[in-house]
From Swiss-Prot:
It is found in: Cellular thylakoid membrane. It is a peripheral membrane protein. Keywords: Membrane, Photosynthesis, Photosystem II, Thylakoid. It comes from Crocosphaera subtropica (strain ATCC 51142 / BH68) (Cyanothece sp. (strain ATCC 51142)). This is Photosystem II reaction center Psb28 protein. The gene is psb28. The lineage of its organism: Bacteria, Bacillati, Cyanobacteriota, Cyanophyceae, Oscillatoriophycideae. The keyword Membrane applies.
Length: 111
């Protein structure tokens, strides 16, 4: 099962908007995840955000580039950036996203 976590072992049920960019050479790329009102920011949540973990049967992809957005002093969203520096990292990310998309009803559209 493909899951996104902000704290190890705690799945985030909010499905993000994901934007992809890729170098013309194909050797590097960036995925930007935007979560509106994720449950990790709920007042009842006591878990710390330690990164973003993309977990599936192949293992785990990790980024520490996670930022919160605050409006009037209250957390409203989380943005995470995953940088891929090789074709292998890109391919691994795409395999994760295919699984995650199937499980969460996501589609893909080219900009």
């Amino acid at each position: 099962m493909a899951q996104i976590q902000f704290s190890r072992g705690v799945s985030e049920p909010v499905v993000p908007e994901v934007r992809l960019t890729r170098a013309k050479s194909g050797n590097s790329g960036t995925a930007t995840f935007r979560f509106e009102s994720p449950t990790i920011l709920d007042a009842e949540s006591t878990d710390d955000i330690t990164g973003m973990y993309l977990v599936d049967e192949e293992g785990e992809i990790v980024t520490r580039e996670v930022k919160g957005k605050f409006i009037n002093g209250k957390p409203t969203s989380v943005e995470a950036i995953l940088i891929m520096n090789s074709q292998d990292e890109w391919d691994r990310f795409m395999r994760f996203m295919e699984r995650y998309a199937q499980e969460n009803g996501l589609g893909f559209s080219k900009a």
